[in-house]
Regions:
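C-terminal "capping" alpha-helix adjacent to the active site of nucleotide-linked donor transferases
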Residues: 100-127
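Short, ordered loop/turn segments at secondary-structure junctions
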Residues: 22, 85-87, 110-112
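Acidic, glycine-centered active-site loop in nucleotide-sugar glycosyltransferases
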Residues: 76, 94-104
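Hydrophobic/aromatic beta-strand patches that form the interior of the parallel beta-sheet core
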Residues: 17, 45, 60-62, 81, ...
Length: 176
């Protein structure tokens, strides 16, 4: 809720997807807020199985440093602004350090920080483009066959075997 006034100030230029998880009280507060501010375009969801789709439709995600959410954001090319209201929790610190060191990801500790980040990006689109480019440099495209070969090699090492990856489905056996 603390970030909504910042977004509202830019209602003519931004929109938001708000996900509340299973927090029904927050969901009701946001429904009420949205009713009072029809000029701001926002999509509101409780718990969602569609986060992967919502990330693909987003230019940025503001989130805590949960590893799963951050990995999904990276996979779907959606830069992260880390919500550090109350600080970075110990279980979030490695994820935060990875994205801070690797992509110079932004961290916000209050609505003022968010206003500065959003204002800079809106006033200087090249700044957002650079943030996104840095973020995308953290990605790598993995060839699934490479992973399979590495797993087979690891299995061979443990089992002291010499197996090789086989095509799937296996070729039809000829007449005997």
């Amino acid at each position: 809720l603390q970030l909504l006034p910042v977004l509202l100030a830019h209602a003519d230029r931004v929109q938001a997807i708000l996900i509340c998880g299973r927090n029904r009280e927050l969901h009701h507060e946001l429904l009420h807020w949205r009713t009072e501010h029809p000029e701001f375009r926002c999509h509101l969801e409780g718990y969602s199985e569609s986060v992967h789709l919502l990330l693909q439709a987003s230019d940025v995600i503001v989130t805590r440093g949960g590893t799963t959410t951050c990995a999904k954001a990276l996979h779907f090319r959606c830069p992260i602004v880390f919500n550090a209201f109350g600080g970075i929790m110990p279980q979030e610190s490695l994820t935060w350090k990875f994205f801070r060191n690797g992509a110079a990801s932004e961290k916000i500790e209050d609505a003022g920080d968010f206003a500065r980040v959003l204002g800079r990006w809106l006033d200087e689109p090249a700044t957002y483009a650079a943030v996104r480019e840095n973020f995308l440099r953290l990605r790598y495209e993995e060839d699934p066959t490479t992973v399979i070969d590495e797993l087979v090699a690891l299995g061979n090492e443990v089992a002291r075997a010499e197996l090789r990856r086989q095509p799937f489905p296996p070729p039809e056996a000829g007449p005997a």
